[in-house]
């Protein structure tokens, strides 16, 4: 059996934070950019907005068409797929947002069908050889090779202490996978 590669959607394969912030900025006159988000607590960056104002923008079905790929994610995921790696997108997306978000993900990643999308808020329960994620909490205690996808909000996390390999971009991810799990 070929290696199973699990990959996250938000801020790993698609630029979720940029899309989300653009909509919040448009609706509420804020000027925040994704590079400024250095923590998982998004609310601290919007002291004048309610949680409802920040999160309800994701309930608009039209927002998902603004979701774009992270640079080189399409290229390298397609290469891995063509080389025979088994690819599964693993997302903690709320169920109500899944139909529209998954439709957009399938438009962006042609190899991704319904059988290769897993919804799980506890990614440690999903089996695979590799997990690529920007959330350290999704990698800690997982029984897979851990690739922490570098983002501003996880840069202070001590990935070396948790046996995680930090990838600065998709070329790093590709190299790490080939170094650890080459397909012959």
Where are the regions that the model predicts?
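Active-site neighborhood of HAD-like aspartate-dependent phosphohydrolases
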Residues: 1-53
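Short, basic/glycine-rich phosphate-binding loops at helix/coil junctions
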Residues: 45-60, 84-87
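Substrate-recognition element of Asp-dependent hydrolases with the DxDx(T/V) motif
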Residues: 64-68, 73-105
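A structural signal for isolated positions on well-ordered beta-strands in alpha/beta enzyme cores
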Residues: 86-88, 130, 147
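Substrate-recognition "cap/lid" segment bordering the active-site pocket of phosphatases
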Residues: 90-141
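Structural recognition of alpha->loop->beta junctions
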Residues: 104-120, 161-178
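A short acidic, often aromatic-flanked loop/helix-cap motif at beta-alpha or helix-coil junctions
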Residues: 122-128, 154-156, 170-176
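Acidic, Mg2+-coordinating phosphoryl-transfer loop and its flanking beta/alpha structural elements
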Residues: 132-169
